[in-house]
Amino acid sequence: MKKFMMAIVAVLFAAPSFAQYSSGGFSLSESSVYYGLRLGMNMATLTGDDVDAGTKVGLNFAPVIGLRVSDTTPIFLESGLYFTGCGAKKDKASISLNYLEVPILIKYGIQATDDIAVLPFLGPTFRYGLFGGKTKIPGEGKVDSFGDDKFKRADVGIKLGCGAEYNKLYLEAGYQFGITNIANWQLDNDDDASVHNGAFFINVGVNF
């Protein structure tokens, strides 16, 4: 957690230098394609059957690309390849679910000032579980989070939120919720269990 916070601080200190180096301010009327980097955190949890979970902090990191899809209105399509940490934690027990994530977001740009743009967004996100995710059970040690009688690797969700850009610096916050049932086990009555991802997130970054 300490290393993660140091990384966030480093981005915040480095970003003004990048923005000062970059020529000109942001203009929705001039932007057709942009590239960017995102770094931030999830405040993730799990909801559903057999889950009594609190919030777990996870990492977000991604390169992204955005494309303007209309010449007459500031509508953008943004995607990227995220490493994102989800899961849940309560007391000494924890569930870590690490994913590669590809969102497909529709963003609408609102030019607030010459240098500031506000961009609300909404879209689906597609995730696949990576190796390294562990479930920690007190007294039983750690086991893999994905597999039979555990969690499914594939997940589809919805991501929504709002971003703001100032001189190429970018800040966004929002919420993502899973549509897919990621539980890969049955309840005591032989019914399929139902568990879904959910997370508030905040990211900082740059667009160029």
Where does each model-flagged region fall?
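Cleavable N-terminal export/targeting peptides
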Residues: 1-29
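A generic hydrophobic-segment detector
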Residues: 20, 47, 127-179
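Short glycine/proline- and aromatic-enriched beta-strand/turn motifs that initiate or cap beta-hairpins
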Residues: 20-64, 207
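Outer-membrane beta-barrel proteins
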Residues: 25-27, 49-53, 92-94, 110, ...
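Residues that define the transmembrane beta-barrel architecture of outer-membrane proteins
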Residues: 31-33, 53-59, 96-102, 116, ...
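Gram-negative (and chloroplast) outer-membrane scaffold detector with strong preference
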Residues: 33, 41-43, 64-135, 200-208
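Outer-membrane beta-barrel translocator domains and adjoining extracellular loop/strand segments
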Residues: 47-52, 89-95, 132-141, 183-189
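Predominantly the C-terminal beta-signal and adjacent terminal strand-loop region
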Residues: 76-78, 82, 86-92, 147, ...
